[in-house]
Amino acid sequence: MFAIAAPVAARDTIGIYQGWGAFRDASPARCYAIARPVMAGGRSSGFASVATWPKRGLRASLHVRLSRERDRSAGVTLTVGERRFALVANGLDAWAGDAPSDRAIVAAMRSGRSMSVEAVGVGGRPFVDVYALSGAATAIDAAVLGCSGG
């Protein structure tokens, strides 16, 4: 079994679904599916999450913590199967640029076997973080349902 990236502040575990976990925080109400990469190209492990924040109007919103700080002049690309998505990023964090991109990425994750996030690190060395997607769709659904009332 893969290590699950369980946030320190997580209040309730909704469930563990293969390499993905689903969690709910009570205040502010938010739910998320989260996993660590099965292969990290950087110095830390990083994580990928898909969160639902009812009060912010966010549903199934992607966030990736990269395994190393990226060169800010380089882009970040997420790939699932044949689909490639450019992400918005700062030093360590990357996310979809808008809601339609979030929906397209999550749809690709649901049908994919693996997902990779590629960037160039500070110093010019490329790196890639790879995620297994087994259990991702179930964890994402559980997170959405976990916050459906709140």
Regions found by a protein language model. Name each.
Residues 5-7:
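N-terminal signal peptide c-region/cleavage motif recognized by signal peptidases
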Residues 9-150:
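A generic "folded-domain core" signal
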